[in-house]
């Protein structure tokens, strides 16, 4: 009886593994490098909600101040490993596309793990040239319901939402988003 039970368990396990091996490539292809999700209805337009963050001089800055160009908002923190892993890609693409796209690199400044002075030092030490904005009052992160970082919000030049992506992105995926946004291509 034990041998029969063991044989059934082994057969079920083998069947599950075979099914997983067959389905895995299909289920993950939409997340491969260079791809962007195609899960929104292009007939539905959702306007991006406005918020206020602070620049390096502690001047209040509104999202709506930047409508007119495509906008990429990245919510991040210096203690977040996945955030730190994607910052070099953001910096490279900021240098390449800064005339065509607005980059709002928004630090979730909690006053403890991340302070304005510690983030200025972090950015300087890493040689990043992108502008950093500080979400001191959590207006931006609350507005967009940020509960997990990194989170990146893509906004069309007219102020309508293009996409929201949670999790770190590699440079190829991020650049694909940028090219689609500045090329006027709809998802």
Language-model segments: which ranges?
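N-terminal targeting signals for export/organelle localization
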Residues: 1-48, 187
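A short beta-strand-turn-helix
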Residues: 50-71, 95
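Conserved redox-active cysteine motifs that mediate thiol-disulfide chemistry
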Residues: 67, 75-92
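Conserved helix-turn-beta segment immediately C-terminal to the redox Cys motif
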Residues: 69, 87-107, 124, 171, ...
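Hydrophobic beta-strand anchors of alpha/beta hydrolase catalytic cores
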Residues: 72-73, 103, 152
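Thiol-based oxidoreductase modules, predominantly thioredoxin-like and allied folds used
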Residues: 101-114, 129-137
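Short, internal strand/loop/helix patches
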Residues: 120-157
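Thiol-/selenol-based redox modules, centered on thioredoxin-like
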Residues: 154-187
